[in-house]
Curated annotation (Swiss-Prot):
It comes from Conus inscriptus (Engraved cone). Disulfide bonds join 2-8. It comes from the Eukaryota. It is found in: Secreted. The cysteine framework is C-C. InterPro entries: Contryphan_CS (IPR011062). One of its GO terms (cellular component) is extracellular region. Expressed by the venom duct. This is Contryphan-In. Exists in two forms, due to cis-trans isomerization at 5-Tyr-Pro-6. Belongs to the O2 superfamily. Contryphan family. Its target is unknown, but this toxin may modulate voltage-activated calcium channels (Cav) or calcium-dependent potassium channels (KCa).
Amino acid sequence: GCVLYPWC
């Protein structure tokens, strides 16, 4: 679960 980028 990334926070800065939704595509990572």
